[in-house]
Amino acid sequence: MFHCNGWCCTWAIAVVGATHVIQRAIVPTEIFAKIEHWGVTHLCGAPTVLNMLAFSPGSDQRRLKQPVSILTGGAAPSSTVIRAMEQMGFTVIHGYGLTETYGPATICYFQNEWASLDQPEMAKRMARQGARYVTVVGLEVVDPATGTTLPADGTSMGEIVTRGNTVMKGYLKNPKATREMFRGGWFRTGDLGVMHPDGYVELKDRAKDIIISGGENISSLEVEEILARHPAVREVAVVAKPDPHWGETPCAFVALREGVEAPSVDGLIQWCKGQMAHFKRPRHIVFCELPRTSTGKVQKFILRDWAKKAPEKMERSG
């Protein structure tokens, strides 16, 4: 109950008189067993949980006996993970929000016309953060400096702002921070993204996580998405590594799948070739487990510290 998630999904289940199935630890075999035993229909978990289920032993052969809807958020699940979950019989619903917005501000509602798309394209659309949630009055992407609304063209990147009855009034005993977050009458999320023509917002990065290399802005999420498509990659996080010439360059921390031939650093960099611009490709890759908070979020501030100390190339760590 210490997390904003506890204000939403937990009470919704109680209100309709449904049954809670509580898992004390993320053990894929136990989760699958409980889904079957209790006839679970809904599951809520961070992308970390989806990763563990999608890449657990035998998951590629597993098929659920009944459909299970999953609400996930906190980070963008990769299209690779979404495809793996869908193949098992899960329906992935991606949401986006903050504690300051009392949980979800957007939901990626599935559109019927997506069913005709090939699976990679469908998963890509499902990985977006989605359309304005019913409790949110307004949701826009604006120029961070001027507050001007940017066009909904899927390419104009700005800060995601929102307002509505479920947005907080302010930070306790911190009027300065409150004024800063509500500049222009909107709540400033600090997240950078684009608005698509269909009204769906897509998160590109936290403002502090944007990598500026040679004057070019690089979205760490874009690099992560492409690396996550590699068949040996279980999960990945990309941060900026200081560089004396370029200012910053992308540094990727990669956790590998078990039972799959491990790629080399050069092999992963070559994987990126042709899928992204040259300046966006990671120049440093570290193989390791990713540090996380108690709620499963990747601690990028720790990775940024690790990146400063990482050598030019690192075949394996940890």
Regions found by a protein language model. Give the residues of each.
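Short, hinge-like loop/turn segments at secondary-structure boundaries
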Residues: W38-V40, D60-L64, Y109-W114, V254, ...
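Conserved AMP-binding/adenylate-forming
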Residues: A18, E36, V68-I70, P77-G95, ...
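Conserved AMP-binding/adenylation subdomain of ANL enzymes
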Residues: F2-T41, S56
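Acidic/polar alpha-helix N-cap and adjacent early helical turns
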Residues: A307-G318
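Adenylate-forming
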Residues: F2, T29, A33-H37, P47-S69, ...
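Hydrophobic/anchoring residues in structured secondary elements
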Residues: S69-T72, V238, H284-F287
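AMP-binding/adenylate-forming catalytic core of the ANL superfamily
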Residues: L43, G164, K169-G170, E180, ...
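Structural motif
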Residues: R24, W38, P57, V137, ...
